[in-house]
């Protein structure tokens, strides 16, 4: 698991100014709430007084109130009031980590890391969200799998033929399967997008709704370790529209064996409201087929070395993803989960926030990370 990237915290409707919203990421507790202006905030969910969960308390005047002794924390993570001190100022050490927040696509995201704003990898920009001619459906998927396994599944086009027989597209011909995927590097990730076979028969999902020139293309890419994109194009209509599904997966690694996926499914065809349920049924059938595989992988986590698997040319996008993970490990961003597990229960940990670069004297320990390379690789550049 990696610090210094954007992670989904909860749906916008789950984060309120009335009740704190608790969530676990990397096996660590976080709390989200809104201030009096409706702005969302995300803090480490451990009161530095005696270790209580702020998420078990309540929100008052835009502050998270600890249920144990009433300590009040503002959106910046500073304790602004200690009831037992009366009007006296709380100690300077009375603070918890507060994380940068963005609210997009009906989801609250937090940047879990300490990089300054100018150096942060971006949150993926879904340009068509909210645009005329596009429709969005959002799903929350609770999956008993490691999040990297889920991302790698999305970067694997060959499994479609075997796991999703009714999907129709994308299907790779034997000739394509023998060739390495045409993977290119993009900022903070890698990508493939290419023509595919489109095998239609009477059982193919949504086949009867397709019309126009067949221009089947599909591909997937990732941005960071936990943001996955899949585009599937079908036909070109008389007005020049390319009918497509654009699917976006924002993955929340709860722990090493559980993932909460925020799945944004967008389409520019089948736009009638009466078709929403049919599209949803087909979509969730495909999702369920993937989950059935992911929840039964051995080992649960991605192998530490590619030599522990027999990889094929069609796995090139998976290999490229793992190369990116190694680069981020070289930067010192890979959480040492073994060291963390060893000390959890004896100490309280937090993902370091940007404020730690400006001040010291923090009570919560920063999560241990694996040592980075002596010289980190430069940021991944876009391919012209």
Which residues does each predicted region cover?
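C-terminal catalytic domain of Rieske-type non-heme iron oxygenases
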Residues: 39, 118-384
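Hydrophobic, proline/glycine-rich low-complexity stretches
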Residues: 1-5
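Rieske [2Fe-2S] iron-sulfur-binding domain
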Residues: 8-135, 350-384
């Amino acid at each position: 698991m990696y610090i210094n990237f954007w992670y989904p915290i909860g749906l916008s409707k789950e984060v309120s100014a009335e009740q704190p919203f608790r969530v676990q990421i990397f096996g660590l507790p976080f709390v989200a709430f809104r201030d009096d202006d409706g702005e969302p905030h995300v803090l480490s969910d451990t009161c530095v007084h005696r270790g209580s969960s702020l998420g078990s308390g309540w929100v008052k005047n835009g502050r998270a109130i600890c249920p144990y002794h009433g300590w009040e924390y503002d959106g910046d993570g500073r304790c602004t009031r200690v009831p037992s001190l009366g009007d006296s100022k709380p100690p300077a050490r009375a603070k918890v980590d507060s994380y940068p927040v963005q609210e997009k696509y009906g989801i609250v995201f937090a940047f879990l890391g300490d990089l300054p704003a100018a150096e942060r990898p971006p949150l993926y920009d879904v340009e068509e969200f909210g645009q005329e001619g596009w429709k969005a459906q959002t799903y929350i998927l609770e999956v008993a799998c490691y999040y990297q396994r889920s991302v790698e599944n999305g970067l694997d086009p060959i499994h479609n033929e075997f796991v999703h027989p009714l999907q129709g597209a994308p299907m790779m011909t034997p000739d394509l399967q023998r060739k390495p995927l045409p993977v290119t590097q993009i900022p903070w990730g890698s990508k493939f997008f290419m023509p595919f076979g489109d095998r239609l028969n009477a059982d193919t999902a949504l086949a009867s709704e397709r019309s126009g020139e067949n221009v089947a293309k599909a591909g997937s890419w990732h941005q960071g370790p936990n943001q996955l994109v899949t585009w599937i194009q079908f036909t070109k209509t008389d007005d020049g529209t390319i009918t497509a599904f654009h699917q976006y997966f924002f993955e929340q690694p709860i722990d090493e064996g559980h993932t909460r996926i925020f799945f944004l499914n967008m389409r520019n065809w089948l736009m009638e409201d009466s078709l929403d349920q049919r599209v949803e049924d087909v979509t969730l059938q495909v999702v369920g087929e993937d989950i059935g595989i992911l929840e039964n992988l051995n080992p649960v986590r991605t192998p530490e070395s590619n030599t522990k698997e027999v990889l094929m040319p069609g796995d090139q996008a998976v290999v490229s993803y793992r190369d990116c993970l190694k680069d981020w490990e070289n930067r010192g961003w890979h959480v040492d989960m073994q060291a963390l597990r060893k000390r959890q229960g004896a100490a309280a940990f937090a993902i370091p926030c940007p404020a730690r670069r400006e001040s010291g004297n923090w009570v919560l320990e920063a999560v241990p990370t694996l040592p980075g390379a002596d010289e980190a690789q430069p940021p991944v550049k876009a391919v012209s």
